[in-house]
Amino acid sequence: MAKAIREIYGETLAELGNTMENLVVLDADVAGSTKSALFKAAHPDRFFDMGIAEANMAATAAGLATTGYVPFINTFAVFITSASLLALRGQICYGNLNVKLGGAYAGMSDARDGATHHALEDMAILRALPNMKILSISDAAETRWATRYAAQCSGPCYIRLSRDVLPDLYPQDHKFT
């Protein structure tokens, strides 16, 4: 049975935590929704719930990155580009820090919560920031690849995640470039 993209993301983070001792996950009080709770269950000592304080979460991740950690920050996509933008721009992107962003419920996939939770402009905003890589995924195989790629690449990287179950477009063993 197919799984929601955000669940694949959470599972992959937990798997990466098994081999990357410097991987830490921060979440803005939505770990059940972003599925970063799967990482928390596997690695509770490397999970930080920052509460509804996205700018603080981004600034904390910047500090962690300067000490050798690979932080993944997680919240709804709309809050990555609104509530945390100053820290992203001024600290993470200008500093080319190794911080990863998991933007859940991107686009209109959070229709139930209304227009305030739609992230339609997230890629437009983030592509204007220096050093930012953007990975907009399309299915489960690409989500696994993108999460692993983000963990290994250097510098800031945004993974745009849907809330929904998406049909498989690629075989699980597809080689992305």
Indicate where each model-derived feature is located:
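Thiamine diphosphate
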Residues: M1-L166, Y170, H174-T177
